Amino acid sequence: LEKQNNYYTLYECTESDINIHVLNPYKKLLFGLEDEKEICDLIANKETKIITITVTEKGYHYNTINKSLDLNEDIKNDLENKKIKTLVGHISYGLIQRFKENKEDIYIISCDNLSQNGDILKKVVTDFVSHIDKNIATWIEEKVKFPCTMVDCIVPNTKKLPKEVEEKFKDNSLVLCEPYRDWYIENKSEFLKSQLVHERIKFVDNIKFYESIKLKILNASHSALAYLGLLLGHKYVHEAIDDELCYNFINNYLDKEVIPTIKKQDNFDLVQYKKDVLKRFRNHF
């Protein structure tokens, strides 16, 4: 990104076309292993009100058996206040500094594909800080907001790009995505609503419902379609969905086996979501 002056290209790929967006949302890039002081200063700065996190599941160092912080070597390194190696360490030391300097409210929002992501992030951070100062851990527990969220957008791997994309122009940091996207945030904060304004950002009371419909209608049917398609000689999901046998199987599976098990909420249109999912599967990108 630095070689491109922080610009990157978003290729929004539809079934038949590519919409290209050149984006420059970053004022400055920092590297966690080198810029720990500046990162902690930014977290502590009272002008910082919202932090979003995208780090993948492993970055949380969460022990799913004990449901607590995994005290592995990297976490132990950070607890010993050596050169910080983890996201948990950066967030924790930044919040410790914030507690000492101003105690201002802050929202830390996980965008990772992880069920109850906000609760998990809150747990690992408070566990980490409790090893250093239990009073500060209590402040984080009570005052720092960690909303749970769910992002619904398919973002393909860019290691092997479609020919249509490679022929456009070179970009070392390009991102591919489908046109469909929703971001659900479990929080009714008027402040967040005023700061995160977009028609595809939706504030909800119960994120578990939206996690459930994504897992059951999108993820499960994607897997089922892939398995059946492979058995029938198809290489890609978009090829399988164009096979009448596969389409009928998935459509009936969703209508008869999945949707009836989901209790409707917030006037969410499950049938329309199913139609959107089947359309998304036709996207050959």
Regions found by a protein language model. Name each.
Residues L1-F285:
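Substrate/ligand-engaging "lid" and interaction regions
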